[in-house]
């Protein structure tokens, strides 16, 4: 396992965790991921792995390993928000996610509205809500209007499919509708706590 951070090393490490059958391997992988958390590019790379539903098209790793690596990446991302979204000191080193990186992350997170894996989508909805608690409306004023637009457009597409009796072909708008509603529900839940 490569100990220097890079996006490919992160993918390999997450895949190793996804196929690990023993506690020692999981502990080693977890320790490596903990070290990388302080790297500035780690959070965007982690999110890229988590939301890359088509990244294993050449079958480099078994499908179930790839899916589990994506899920693990999203869970680690979600769990790191409360710890690293705001600047902090870790082992006497300032850990900061730049404003530009945060903006890219917020934009990329909304790709979850089209996420085919339910487990990734659920964890991403919680991650969005945690970030929204800190950044909405100041840094992320477009969050609620974007979710509202997604809900309206997806509902209209589902309705049109139902009227034309092609509801079986409306899986993508239905998925978007469900995910947008789930993200909004998680945000409201986070705002009221």
Task: For the regions a language model picked out, list residue spans one by one.
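Compositionally biased, intrinsically disordered low-complexity segments enriched
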Residues: 153-163
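Alpha-helical solenoid scaffolds in large eukaryotic transport, assembly, and signaling factors
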Residues: 2-151, 176-193
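Basic, Lys/Arg- and aromatic-enriched nucleic-acid-binding interface segment
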Residues: 173
């Amino acid at each position: 396992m490569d100990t220097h951070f890079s996006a490919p090393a992160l993918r390999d490490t997450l895949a190793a965790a996804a196929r690990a059958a023993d506690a020692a391997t999981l502990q080693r992988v977890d320790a490596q991921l903990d070290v990388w958390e302080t790297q500035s590019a780690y959070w965007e790379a982690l999110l890229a792995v988590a939301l890359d539903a088509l990244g294993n098209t050449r079958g480099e790793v078994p499908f179930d390993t790839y899916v589990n690596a994506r899920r693990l990446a999203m869970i680690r991302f979600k769990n790191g928000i409360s710890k690293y979204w705001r600047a902090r000191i870790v082992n006497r080193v300032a850990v900061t996610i730049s404003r530009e990186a945060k903006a890219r992350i917020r934009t990329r997170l909304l790709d979850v509205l089209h996420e085919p894996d339910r487990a990734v989508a659920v964890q991403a909805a919680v991650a969005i809500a945690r970030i929204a608690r800190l950044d909405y409306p100041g840094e992320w004023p477009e969050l609620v209007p974007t979710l509202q637009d997604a809900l309206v457009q997806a509902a209209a597409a589902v309705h049109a499919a139902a009227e034309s009796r092609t509801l079986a072909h409306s899986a993508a708008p239905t998925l978007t509708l469900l995910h947008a509603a789930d993200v909004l529900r998680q945000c409201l839940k986070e705002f009221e706590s």
